[in-house]
């Protein structure tokens, strides 16, 4: 693990997505400081979450909140979301819930959320799935212990 500033990490991810022409915006970001994490692993988790967001929706929004205890990184989209009863299932390896979302936008093998959840656990955290209050689709929140 390295000492990383979450603002810098998100700036790098935003630059990469914008170079790729993807509709990803930066939402609310709060808290300052650095924390120990594996930047390549966290970037991979966020790339997976952004990829899912853009597969099922047309836009995504990234945000973070850093506190004394945790870093919360959220990826929200405007897609159909995942029904609450199926969210736990969606975190399992090879889970494909395309019929719950949009069968025309599948194509993954069902590992993106599972990998992100594993990366969260390796940082003493968790991946939470919910509904985006603003965009209406899925909100995937990577919570990493500080």
Task: Give residue spans per PLM region.
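Short alpha-helical Gxxx[C/S/T] motif in the catalytic ATP-binding
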Residues: 49, 112, 116
């Amino acid at each position: 693990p390295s000492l990383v500033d979450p603002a810098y990490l998100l700036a790098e991810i935003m630059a990469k997505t914008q170079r790729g022409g993807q509709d990803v915006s930066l939402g609310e970001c709060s808290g300052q400081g650095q924390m120990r994490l594996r930047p390549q692993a966290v970037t991979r988790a966020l790339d997976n979450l952004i990829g899912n967001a853009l597969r099922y929706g047309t836009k995504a929004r990234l945000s973070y909140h850093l506190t004394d205890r945790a870093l919360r990184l959220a990826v929200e989209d405007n897609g159909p979301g995942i029904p609450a009863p199926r969210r736990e299932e969606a975190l399992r390896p090879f889970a494909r819930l395309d019929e719950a979302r949009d069968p025309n936008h599948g194509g993954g093998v069902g590992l993106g959320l599972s990998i992100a959840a594993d990366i969260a656990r390796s940082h003493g955290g968790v991946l939470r799935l919910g509904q985006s209050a603003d965009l209406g689709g899925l909100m995937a929140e990577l919570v990493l212990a500080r």
